[in-house]
Amino acid sequence: MTRDVVRKARLSGERTEDIESLLSSMEADRNIASSDVLVDMAHLVMLTRQQIVHEDHAKTLMKELLCMYESGVPAEAFDPSYEDIHAGIETILTRKTGGDVGGRLHIGRSRNDEVATCLRIRTRDIILDQLEALTRLRSVLLSVAADHITTVMPGFTHLQHAQPVTLAHHLLAYEQMFSRDFDRLFDALRRVNCSPLGSAALASTGYPLDRPFTADLLGFDRILVNSMDAVASRDFAEETLACDTMLLTNISRFCEELIIWSSAFVQFVNLDDRYCSTSSIMPQKKNPDVAEILRSRTGTILGSFVSAITIVKGLPMAYNRDLQDLNPHLWRGITGVRRDIDLLAGMVESATFNRERMAEEAGRGGTTTTELADTLVREFNIPFRTAHHIVGKAVKDGSLDLVTLDRGAEEFYGKTLSSLGVTQKNIDSALSVSTSLSVRKLPGGPAPDAVLDALAERRKELEKDIELICDKKTQISASLHELLTQARRIAQL
């Protein structure tokens, strides 16, 4: 007969290996084993405080739980004969303390609310790690950008040369994208950090549990009030996967550019050797493998997100076992994201950007012709669309000298630019990269002064975000410290 204390009375007969394999969540539960011990401790502190469990029984149980907390969940608890880690831990506790003691830990609780609570604790911790990593990445981007205020390069649309920008301006675009990823994750954390504990199977319990108390001990911001929603909903997992999918999409876009920029025919950047590999046959190769794998990670997490949301979409209230199959997708999707962020930060920080090559390309491909058209509008009062036609015709004809522009002006405006006072000097000045950059000084533009202002503003925003994380981690740490203090008091250690 199975050793699982949950199963042995109601159900008889040994399960086949196939059934055990299908129903077991043990591998995925490795992610929440330590969280389960914390949940057990908080629940037991509350049961003792509410005089539901006698202090002597609580003392015996808490000693074992503290041992698990300090030494780690024993390998025996992960035996595949248990359906999940919760049954494994309870079985071991019952064996060590006896049925009269160990059997009291689960009073007023179901695995439904227990699992949901553990999932939220672990997801919360992962999100906080990701948020910290994002602040490091953003700090790197701001630091590298500060070194490249005047490093000119072409900006692209459709992967074609478009207008001159600076490397600093380009990097600030990504920093701003990653700041929104931070905002999304931090906002999601508000909905993740809610306690289902005390909801039991679906209809709460007749025991006088103190749900807000256990929520405080575990560092939650509040309880999930409706007990059915608390155990049946996994939108916190779906939302976290969605946020991380968008984050990795932004990482993928950046990596795509680094891959292109590091190619022999572009040569905008030289990636540090640590982030590259060579070929097993071609000795000259330096392949941007880390960037390529990071680019591919979007596909992995998108698959996890789609799988998770599809599992949930047809489930009636309240708990259904289908939800167990969501957990591996959650962990597969989100557990590697902090590493991905850190790798990108390291890759950017250690990269060498080729200022000369960027400058060579900055004025190629007609990148400054927009400024020429704008000059005709600003200084000579030509309608913009007409100026656009005049310059576009000159580009098509292959020359941007005054003679060629005059021909276009006569065709589209009925008079030459020369007759309006336009000189070759006006044209040459408008076509210079420095002019194109210097006039684009609106907030968020690539002009050096505008970039310096943006850097200062972004640093302020980053400092605020770092403070947000620090405050949240301090709050959670204080709660867990109080939990351990009360647990040790009960265990009289």
From Swiss-Prot:
The keyword Lyase applies. It is found in: Cytoplasm. Keywords: Amino-acid biosynthesis, Arginine biosynthesis, Cytoplasm, Lyase. It catalyses: 2-(N(omega)-L-arginino)succinate = fumarate + L-arginine. One of its GO terms (cellular component) is cytosol. Pathway: Amino-acid biosynthesis; L-arginine biosynthesis; L-arginine from L-ornithine and carbamoyl phosphate: step 3/3. SUPFAM superfamilies: L-aspartase-like (SSF48557). Its EC number is 4.3.2.1. GO terms for molecular function: argininosuccinate lyase activity. GO terms for biological process: arginine biosynthetic process via ornithine; L-arginine biosynthetic process. Its main location: cytoplasm. Belongs to the lyase 1 family. Argininosuccinate lyase subfamily. NCBIfam families: argH. This is Argininosuccinate lyase. The gene is argH.
